[in-house]
Amino acid sequence: MRSLNLARYALSACAAAAIVSGCGGSQPLAGPAMMPQQARSAPHTVPEWKARGQARSACPEVVGKPTCFALIKTKGASPACIGSSCGWAPLDLQTRYKLPIAKGAGQIVAIVDAGDNPSAASDLSTYRTQFGLGTAVFSKYNQEGQQGNYPTYTGWSVEIDLDIEMVSATCPKCTIFLVEANSSDNADLEAAEAEAVTLGAHIVSNSWGCYGSISCVGQSYFDTPGVAYLAATGDAGLNQMGAPAALASVAAIGGTQLAKNGSQYSETIWSGAGGGCVTGIAKPKWQHDNVCSARAAADGSAEAGCSPGVSEFDSFDGGWFGVCGTSAASPIVAGAFGLAGNATKQNGGRTFWLRKHRKHLYDVCSSQCLFSTYSYGGGWGSPNGLGAL
């Protein structure tokens, strides 16, 4: 059994509250996992992406309330970048994850975000044209299911474009529904989550969450039979994640750092990836580890690192730029679920935990594995084809 290099991985842990106010100290992550409810008062280190000035948060950094997780690169990206010069392109993701992109037609992937991005459709068109992905099958709705009467802008436009573009990158033929909640209040996001299912989506991706709270949204809104719910684990490192990723009915998607040497890709755990032993959430029957007595997260993972991040086009916020964070990972994997076409058979993150699926997931934790090829930040790894989905 491989052991987790706790001292090294502890560098990633920082509650959002500490990100805002500045962390006053550090605490190694040895010993029992910290309860998410304790995140406000415990000392933490600053996440590496913030300490190195690699990125900034696209949304307000708050604790206990829903916020988007998208990070905008501030280091290593040219202000005049275009397309693949801003970060990883769709072809990189398709190649690394061995995705058969001719599949996915008719599969509906819903994105739930807060507030309106008035240029979402045109931005998606620009992104897809740049990378030769063809015309999108895309619809935008408000939380009542109307194609109009959209909410006001809430600052989530970067997140919105990132989400719909990453689904396009990994499943160009998937149908994409963007469901915009009236605000980032939990009740509005819950309403949008329910509406996504009413509209017919069997895959729902959420690149937002509540740092330090496992109860900020109702579990019932993320537990519909025949629907695969995915959620990003956040970018504050170990033991800071909350709902919806913490919920047992949701596939918690952590983050990796993708790299390329010549024509060969590789991945390691991204230092900012959220995850941990989620005290307060009962351990699902499909989790079989003896390391965490509660719900362990993440379940799976995909590219989230900021070196170089992924390319995004968002005219509302200036055009082309690089973005990173687990906000990218959740829709990347959601698109892969669309290709697999098995969403109606999913049960939270169970598919990642099946032993027979290990060969279809890249081992991303190396010396940082808790057991076998599992780690909190990276789960059981990233897709190696569709066999694990």
Functional labels for PLM-detected ranges:
Residues 1-11:
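Bacterial N-terminal signal peptides that target proteins for export
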Residues 19-22:
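C-terminal motif of bacterial Sec signal peptides marking the signal peptidase cleavage site
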Residues 24-27:
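Bacterial signal peptide processing site
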Residues 31-255, 276-324, 330, 341-350, ...:
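Substrate-binding/charge-relay-adjacent region of secreted/lumenal peptidase catalytic domains
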Residues 186, 259-265:
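Short acidic, Gly/Pro-enriched loop/turn segments at secondary-structure junctions
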Residues 263-274:
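Phosphate/diphosphate-binding glycine-rich loops and adjacent basic-rich segments that engage nucleotide
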Residues 336:
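Walker A/P-loop NTP-binding active-site region of P-loop NTPases
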Residues 366-374:
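Short acidic, Pro/Gly- and aromatic-enriched capping/linker segments at domain boundaries
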